[in-house]
Design a protein with these regions (language model features):
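Short, structurally constrained coil/turn elements
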Residues: 16-18, 81, 167-169
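Short amphipathic alpha-helical segments with coiled-coil-like heptad repeat character
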Residues: 2, 65-66, 169
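Cell wall/extracellular polymer interaction/catalysis modules
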Residues: 22-105, 109, 114-121, 127-128, ...
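Generic anion/oxyanion-binding catalytic loop in active/binding sites
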Residues: 11, 46, 149
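Bacterial N-terminal signal peptides
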Residues: 8-20
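Exported/periplasmic cell-wall-interacting domains
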Residues: 22, 27, 100-221
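Bacterial N-terminal signal peptides that target proteins for export
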Residues: 1-9
């Protein structure tokens, strides 16, 4: 019972940390990180543009920018695919099928899905998943100032649920080294750096507490 109470307290503490870190992440120049996302007039006109060189996402409705945010893209050996795609699968509480953890009783150890490691496999949380190519998607995660992912596109916890609300199955996605919006919108995008943020406790990452649920409206009229 004492162990159960201790673990429950740990989960509560880590959940508080996850939510607090999303609210108080600092941006270049100081201040808390906050993303404003505007409700589209016509959801069928929404288009997503990704600039790999700037590591920016622009969610557009014609010439209107609904949301412009920093992101993390793939490293050179595992690049984010370039080209024209569409969102075709959304999953709010997705877990990775490739890498994550093995649960060994009270121990939780990092492990790839196919590794010869004992225990029950639980994939790494990839909340607010929006898939645009097989095994590639936008999802919540730490955002770094340099390419960091295995090809997916990570959004900060402040931005991921808003992106999820803006796109739907069929939303076009254009990924290129540069985008026309780099010159007009890019300089206004807040930079965020999670590189110094500590990793959450693995025991929390294998629980439902790993998935944040936003409160309040996501999109501004």
């Amino acid at each position: 019972m004492r162990m159960l109470l201790g673990f429950s307290f740990l989960i509560a503490l880590c959940v508080a940390f996850i939510f607090t870190s999303c609210e108080t992440t600092r941006v270049a120049g100081g201040g808390a990180y906050h993303v404003t996302a505007y409700k589209p007039h016509d959801p069928s006109k929404v288009v997503v543009k990704v600039s790999l060189s700037k590591e920016n996402i622009y969610v557009m409705e014609g010439d209107r920018c609904l949301m412009g945010v920093a992101c993390s893209v793939g490293i050179s050996s595992k690049p984010t695919p370039r080209g024209h795609f569409t969102i075709y699968r959304k999953e709010e509480d997705k877990r990775s099928g490739s890498y994550g953890f093995r649960v060994q009783g009270d121990r939780v150890v990092p492990a790839e899905a196919g590794a010869n490691v004992s225990g029950r496999y639980v994939g790494y949380p990839m909340g607010f998943w929006c898939e645009f190519a097989p095994a590639y998607g936008f999802h919540q995660g730490f955002v770094h100032p340099t390419p960091r992912t295995h090809g997916c596109i990570r959004l900060h916890g402040e931005a991921a649920p808003k992106f999820y609300a803006l796109v739907h199955n069929g939303t076009p996605v254009h990924i290129a080294e540069t985008q026309p919006e780099d010159a007009s919108i890019g300089p206004k995008v807040q930079r965020v750096d999670d590189s110094r943020a500590p990793d959450p406790d693995p025991r929390v990452m294998v629980s439902s507490a790993a998935f944040q649920k936003p409160s309040g409206p996501l999109l501004v009229e």
